[in-house]
Amino acid sequence: KEIRKCISCNIGCAGNRIGVNRPIRCTINPAVNEGEGYKKLRVKKSCNIVVIGGGTAGLEAACTAAEVGCTTFLIEKKANLGGLAAEISKIPDKKRLSDFPNYLIHRASKLKNLFIFKNTEATIELVESLNPNIIVNATGSNPLLPPIKGLHENIDKEGGKVSSITNMINHITEYPEDLTGKKVVVIGGGAVGLDVVEFFAPRHADVSIVEMMPVIGNGIDPVSKVGTFTM
């Protein structure tokens, strides 16, 4: 738990070097190529930091602030920390992603000046009561829904056939191993959409991708792209 394990995303390392010759970076370790000199720094006066959102970005921000001496409060409205990374790791081929939020949660647990509120809404009254000098918004984002008639009204509807990625993940254990004869349409051919394809295609479903861009897999690192497109 003390080690920040590689999650095999290939984005900052292989993605930056192969074909584009950019400096190596790391998705989960901002200190790569930058050093960890900040850890030697300490705030010179009392400073309260409020971080809203307990995903990986919020946890990293909260841990870093606490490590340099700030009194830090992290507010998460859900029962669990880790955000989207923890959710995506429920997909079998993405289970290594859980190593990152688990590392951050363990790191946070050792910081006595980091106070974590779970199952808590970040209301104006609560935030003001913590007397913050700095507020960090790490609440994440919502998926972009295309302008398809009826989509907004029917997505994630109980008993319906239209599911968001979050809802699909929450019910991932309910999908049978053999989906022969079933048709799955994935709207969006980016990284997340291709993750969905990788889940359903081996189960023998008839999978189609609908993507507004002229290519699928836009922005995916070259290593993952080769592996996905040869599936």
Where are these regions (language model features)?
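Generic structural signal for well-ordered, non-membrane alpha-helical segments
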Residues: 2, 6, 19, 42, ...
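Rossmann-like dinucleotide/flavin-binding elements
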Residues: 43-74, 116-131, 139-148, 164-222
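Flavin-dependent oxidoreductase catalytic cores
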Residues: 1-51, 56, 61-72, 80, ...
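Short low-complexity, flexible loop/linker segments enriched in glycine and/or proline
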Residues: 1, 87-91, 131-133, 151-153, ...
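Rossmann-like dinucleotide-binding cores of NAD(P)H-dependent redox enzymes
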Residues: 74-110, 197-231
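Repeat-solenoid scaffold signature
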Residues: 1, 107-119, 125
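Short, conserved active-site loop motifs that form the nucleotide-linked donor/cofactor pocket
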Residues: 101, 113-115, 160-162
